[in-house]
């Protein structure tokens, strides 16, 4: 998957693991880093680490990874309740981690975990952290909506404040989908001026997941005219690969990658496609390595049937087409599934008794 994401799909960066999880995870990260180094892409592989003295940094260094995504606290409550430290103590700990990472020749990005709650409840703490760290050599500040609590209006407001106060700083936005707003919030983040977005294949992630790669890519290209360099024709393939390895099925109606999203059911839509593509938008299936299909059922109509017959190389008279359509409608009324593979047998049966 790492090879395909970095090579075929051409994402900018991949965060592949959390430090100190297991020996199996460590072996996997080593393999990914060896591959990435062999193709000159080691700087695009990142590992999540913690403010835990030297432990995470040593673990990541032993894997051969050169980019640390350091997890710090982005809300006062997280700092004082979870770490049981003052902001000043936490900042000192971060600086010690930065110094040790520099000794290991490691690039550091910084997560401000629970940043969204921090901006709502303790913005002075967020700005205290940023003021202390903005000139520290951290390459990117990663701003997560950890609990998925923001809406696009709030994203514009809070990120606008960050960009206004720190205009030359590279910010990434990391959305969670608890309110089904991860994609919308990611769009708002780009409008607010962030430089990077965190997405996952199929939207997989904690709880309700994160913003899905395919959906965000389509919006960036079509709505904001942003060229990300992503190979859209490989998105369907990586989606199926992740579905298989994760065991988490893709919803049939999930935009871009779902099984049914390029299937026309209503006959009037198929008829419109035959007449100057009246029911098509910019999300054409070929763009994503897919093809349009026309469902067979009681709502199909003659246009859908004709499309499927044409794909199979079958030619029927108007009367024969009418009878085939009638038979498919009858099967649909009985809730029976009709596929294109069934169509030759239905045609044969109709012709036999006509």
Give residue spans per PLM region:
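Short, ordered loop/turn segments at secondary-structure junctions
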Residues: 18-19, 50-52, 72-75, 113-115, ...
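General structural feature for long, well-ordered alpha-helical segments within catalytic domains
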Residues: 1, 24-28, 56, 89-93, ...
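Alpha/beta enzyme core
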Residues: 1-13, 34-40, 53-109, 113-169, ...
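Short catalytic-loop micro-motif centered on adjacent basic/acidic residues
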Residues: 14-18, 44-47, 142, 172-174
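Catalytic alpha/beta core domains of metabolic enzymes, predominantly
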Residues: 147-150, 157-275, 279-281
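N-terminal active-site wall of soluble small-molecule enzyme domains
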Residues: 20-40, 45-48, 52-57
């Amino acid at each position: 998957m790492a090879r395909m994401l970095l090579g075929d799909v051409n994402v900018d960066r991949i965060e592949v693991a959390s430090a100190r999880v297991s020996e199996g995870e460590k072996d996997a990260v080593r393999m990914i880093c060896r591959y990435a180094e062999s193709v000159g892409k080691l700087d695009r592989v990142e590992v999540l680490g913690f403010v835990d003295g030297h432990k995470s940094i040593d673990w990541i260094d032993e894997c051969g990874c050169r980019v640390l995504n350091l997890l710090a606290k982005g809300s006062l409550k997280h700092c004082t309740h979870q770490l049981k430290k003052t902001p000043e103590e936490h900042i000192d700990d971060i600086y010690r981690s930065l110094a040790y990472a520099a000794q290991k020749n490691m690039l550091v990005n910084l997560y401000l975990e629970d940043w969204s709650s921090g901006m709502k409840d303790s913005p002075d703490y967020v700005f205290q952290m940023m003021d202390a760290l903005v000139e520290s050599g951290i390459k990117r500040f990663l701003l997560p909506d950890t609990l998925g609590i923001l809406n696009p209006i709030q994203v514009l407001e809070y990120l606008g404040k960050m960009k206004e106060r720190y205009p030359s700083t590279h910010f990434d936005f990391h959305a969670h989908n608890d309110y089904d707003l991860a994609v919308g919030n990611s769009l708002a983040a780009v409008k607010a001026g962030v430089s990077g977005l965190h997405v996952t294949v199929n939207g997989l992630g904690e709880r309700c997941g994160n913003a899905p790669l395919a959906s965000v890519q389509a919006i960036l290209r079509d709505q904001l005219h942003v060229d990300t360099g992503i190979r859209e024709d490989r998105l369907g393939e990586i989606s199926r690969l992740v579905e298989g390895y994760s065991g988490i099925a893709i919803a049939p109606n999930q935009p871009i990658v779902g099984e049914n999203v390029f299937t026309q059911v209503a006959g009037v839509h198929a008829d419109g496609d035959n007449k100057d593509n009246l029911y098509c938008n910019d999300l054409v299936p070929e763009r994503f390595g897919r093809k349009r299909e026309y469902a067979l059922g009681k709502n199909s109509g003659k246009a859908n049937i004709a499309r499927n017959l044409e794909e199979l190389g079958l030619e029927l008279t108007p009367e024969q087409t009418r009878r085939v359509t009638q038979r498919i409608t009858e099967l649909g009324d009985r809730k029976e599934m009709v596929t294109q593979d069934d169509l030759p047998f239905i045609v044969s049966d109709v012709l036999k008794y006509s």
